Amino acid sequence: TGVSLEDIESATFERFPQLATRRKQLAGTLSGGEQQMLAMSRALGTNPRILLLDELSMGLAPIIVKDLYQIVHQLSQEGIAVLVVEQFARTVLGVSNKAGIMINGKIVREGEPNELEEQLSAAYLGKKSSNS
């Protein structure tokens, strides 16, 4: 890719400052959130046009989830397309510019996050929304 290891490391620690203090630690000894940050930084080191994230929040503390989704939002602002599969859809809607709801492997709704918010609430509560 023409990017030096030092540049990748510098960009990683700028985006994920928590990892800088853990630079000598084995990856397997990092916390769950730090392991997610490390996985994201590995992927970002390849300068992707799209980043796929599957259940980013799984097993993580809410404050870590918030931090990770702020990074997802920043990546989107930088022009990287980010596709997130997330069981806790509201978490993703706050940082998305387009979203879809999938049920049983099929996309049943697509649109702007604010449009889907009401439909999501209705789906959780088993009610029909005004947009159904």
Segments the model singles out, each with a brief description of its role:
Residues 14, 101-110, 115-132:
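C-terminal boundary and immediately downstream tail of ABC-type ATPase nucleotide-binding domains
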Residues 26-30:
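Conserved ABC ATPase signature
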Residues 43-44:
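ABC ATPase C-loop
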Residues 47:
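Conserved catalytic motifs of ABC-family nucleotide-binding domains
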Residues 55-56:
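Walker B catalytic motif
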Residues 65-78:
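Helical segment within the ABC ATPase nucleotide-binding domain
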Residues 86-87:
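H-loop/switch region of ABC-family ATPase nucleotide-binding domains
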Residues 94-101:
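Conserved catalytic segment of ABC-fold P-loop ATPases
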